[in-house]
Amino acid sequence: MGQKVHPNGIRLGITKPWISTWYADKSDYANNLSSDWEVRKFLEKKLKQASVSKIVIERPAKSVRVTIHTARPGVVIGKKGEDVEKLRNEVAKLTGIPAQINIAEIRKPELDAKLVAEGIASQLERRVMFRRAMKRAVQNAMRLGAKGIKVEVSGRLGGAEIARSEWYREGRVPLHTLRADIDYSTAESHTQYGVIGVKVWVFKGEVLDGVVPALEEPKQQPKRKPRGK
C-alpha cells in the first residue's frame, strides 16, 4: 500500500539524535519516561505562542536539563529572564529534582519542519486557501537553501464533503537515503469543517561523516565525423 516509515525514527542513531538522552535502572525508567512526557506536555501548552520546534531533555547526576529550541527566544525568556525562571521552578516541581533550562535559537524557522507545519495549520484555521499556504511555505524554504521540501494536507479541504489528501513538492526528498538529513513533522489544524492534518518533509542535504560520495565519471562524448567525408 506504499506506506512510509517515519523519517525520524528510521534515522535515530544514524543522522538523528534522540530528544531524551539519559540512562536509568529498571526501577527508575518508567518514572523518568512519565516525567519527560509531563514536562513536554506542560512546556508545549505554556509556550504555544513561542514557536517551539523541539524540547530536548537530559538527566545528568540527580538533576534535569531541558533545552528548548525556539524561533522566538525573547518570548520564552521574558523581561529580564523572569519567564524562564518561572519555567525552571515549574519543571523542578514536576520532576522533583533541580532543573536547568537552556534556550537554543532557531535561525531559519522556514527550514524547520515543525514550525513550517504549524505555520500552515494556523493559516488554514484563518481560512487561507490550502494551496496558497502550501506553495508559500515551499517557496520560502527553497529560497532559504533547502535542497527539497514536500508538504501534504489531508482532510475536508476547502470544506469539501469528502476528505482527501493533496501534496506539493519542490526539489528532491530522498526518503530511502539514510544519510539524507530529512526533517519531518506534523501538525493539526482545527477548522469548522473538522481536523486537517499537515505533514512536512524538509531535505537539507546529505550528512557525510568522513564518507566521500562516489562521484559519477563524466560520460565521453561520441566523436563527430567531419562534414563532407
Swiss-Prot record:
UniProt keyword Repressor, yes or no: no
Pfam families hit by this protein: KH_2 (PF07650), Ribosomal_S3_C (PF00189)
InterPro entries: KH_dom (IPR004087), KH_dom-like_a/b (IPR015946), KH_dom_type_2 (IPR004044), KH_sf_prok-type (IPR009019), Ribosomal_S3_C_sf (IPR036419), Ribosomal_uS3_bac-typ (IPR005704), Ribosomal_uS3_C (IPR001351), Ribosomal_uS3_CS (IPR018280)
Organism whose genome encodes this protein: Shewanella loihica (strain ATCC BAA-1088 / PV-4)
Disulphide-bonded residues: none
Top-level taxonomy: Bacteria, Pseudomonadati, Pseudomonadota, Gammaproteobacteria, Alteromonadales
Originating gene: rpsC
Alphabetized UniProt keyword annotations: Ribonucleoprotein, Ribosomal protein, RNA-binding, rRNA-binding
Protein name in the entry: Small ribosomal subunit protein uS3
GO terms classed as biological process: translation
